[in-house]
Amino acid sequence: MVKLRLKRCGRKQRAVYRIVAIDVRSRREGRDLQKVGFYDPIKNQTYLNVPAVLYFLGKGAQPTGTVHDISKKAEIFKELRVNQTIRVNQTKGGLHI
């Protein structure tokens, strides 16, 4: 199972986190599948690669609590729901994507 979670970077007392897609069995600093963004809690800056996040969420990846909150602020889940609604409407009409 794949999770979207934070990977700690930076130096002592000055943490910066990468948001990564990683296998559940890997440790926090383990090898990730893909980097999908970063989060700086001190400057309160966030960057998300939205297509990559939507790809992993569409494939069944589960975000951790903190990544879920960050994604919620960035309104990622609204985009995911819009994409799912379009796909459902097209499949009902006979189009398969």
From Swiss-Prot:
GO MF annotation: an example: structural constituent of ribosome
Q: Does the keyword Ribosomal protein apply?
A: yes
State where the protein is found: Plastid, Chloroplast
Where is this chain primarily localised? plastid
Q: Give the record's keywords alphabetically.
A: Chloroplast, Plastid, Ribonucleoprotein, Ribosomal protein
Q: GO CC terms on record?
A: chloroplast; mitochondrion; small ribosomal subunit
Q: Which InterPro entries match?
A: Ribosomal_bS16, Ribosomal_bS16_CS, Ribosomal_bS16_dom_sf
Q: What is this protein called?
A: Small ribosomal subunit protein bS16c
What is one process in the GO biological process aspect for this record?
Answer: mitochondrial translation
The text of the family note is:
Belongs to the bacterial ribosomal protein bS16 family.
